[in-house]
UniProtKB/Swiss-Prot annotation:
GO molecular function (one): lipid binding
TM annotation in the entry: 9-29, 49-69
Family the UniProt entry places it in: Belongs to the ATPase C chain family.
Origin species: Micrococcus luteus (strain ATCC 4698 / DSM 20030 / JCM 1464 / CCM 169 / CCUG 5858 / IAM 1056 / NBRC 3333 / NCIMB 9278 / NCTC 2665 / VKM Ac-2230) (Micrococcus lysodeikticus)
Subunit-level organization: F-type ATPases have 2 components, F(1) - the catalytic core - and F(0) - the membrane proton channel. F(1) has five subunits: alpha(3), beta(3), gamma(1), delta(1), epsilon(1). F(0) has three main subunits: a(1), b(2) and c(10-14). The alpha and beta chains form an alternating ring which encloses part of the gamma chain. F(1) is attached to F(0) by a central stalk formed by the gamma and epsilon chains, while a peripheral stalk is formed by the delta and b chains.
SUPFAM superfamilies: F1F0 ATP synthase subunit C (SSF81333)
Subcellular location as annotated: Cell membrane
Cellular component, GO annotation: plasma membrane; proton-transporting ATP synthase complex; proton-transporting two-sector ATPase complex, proton-transporting domain
Chief location: membrane
Membrane-topology annotation of the record: Multi-pass membrane protein
Function: F(1)F(0) ATP synthase produces ATP from ADP in the presence of a proton or sodium gradient. F-type ATPases consist of two structural domains, F(1) containing the extramembraneous catalytic core and F(0) containing the membrane proton channel, linked together by a central stalk and a peripheral stalk. During catalysis, ATP synthesis in the catalytic domain of F(1) is coupled via a rotary mechanism of the central stalk subunits to proton translocation. Key component of the F(0) channel; it plays a direct role in translocation across the membrane. A homomeric c-ring of between 10-14 subunits forms the central stalk rotor element with the F(1) delta and epsilon subunits.
Protein name: ATP synthase subunit c
Site location (Reversibly protonated during proton transport): E56
Gene3D superfamilies according to UniProt: F1F0 ATP synthase subunit C (1.20.20.10)
Length: 71
């Protein structure tokens, strides 16, 4: 049995799920850290946003690779 078509989209879906889990963990840790030490918000917020950007970049790269490989 041979599979054709949208297997690359399954890979993108897995990349998006991984990215979503990563973003959830990043902001859960950020909220937990700010709840424990509110004065550390100015230090933790840029780190959380950088982590968010890197996690979302992986999802965007997964989407790009899904379309490039599929073409």
């Amino acid at each position: 049995m041979e599979l054709h078509g949208s297997l690359n989209m399954i890979g993108y879906g897995l990349a998006a799920i991984g990215s979503a889990i990563g973003v959830g963990l990043i902001f859960a840790a950020y909220i937990n850290g700010v709840a424990r030490q509110p004065e550390a918000q100015r230090i933790l917020q840029p780190i959380a946003l950088l982590g968010f950007a890197l996690a979302e970049a992986l999802a965007i790269l997964g989407l790009v690779f899904a379309f490039v490989i599929g073409a």
